[in-house]
Amino acid sequence: SNSHIQIEEKQFFEKNELKIILDLYAKMVSEGSWKDYGLNISSKQVSFSVFKNAAENALYKICKNFKPKNKNLKYLITDTSGKILKNSFDLKTLLKNTSWKKLQ
């Protein structure tokens, strides 16, 4: 019997987290601030990258850490090089209180 074999679950944004991010993305696109996005998944985190245009590096990455060292590092906004610009234990709070134009 193979019942002891665990199928590794691919970790990702939860459905409600993705909705929060995509709602923000749609708003920023309609304002002309963002033009494109990308998703990256590793064993440690998933990130949603936003681009001003396709030829450039990502402006920002909205990241979710699967096993953060402390709960305030669960959700991050980083720049292209991975420097943490903002962090929170709550995604909605993190994004709602962000002034994107002033972030860099």
Q: Which residues does each PLM region occupy?
A:
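Short aromatic-glycine-(Arg/Gly/Cys) micro-motifs in beta-strand/loop hairpins
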Residues: 1-2, 60-81
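Negatively charged, low-complexity tracts enriched in Asp/Glu with abundant Ser/Thr
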Residues: 1-46
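Short, charged/polar surface micro-motifs in flexible loops or helix N-caps
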Residues: 43-46, 53-58
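Hydrophobic residues embedded in beta-strands of well-ordered beta-sheets
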Residues: 46-48, 75
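Short, charged/polar low-complexity linear motifs in solvent-exposed/disordered segments
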Residues: 54, 103-104
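Local beta-strand/beta-hairpin segments that build beta-sheet-rich folds
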Residues: 57-60, 85
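Mixed-charge, glycine-accented linear interaction segment located at domain edges/termini
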Residues: 71, 75-103
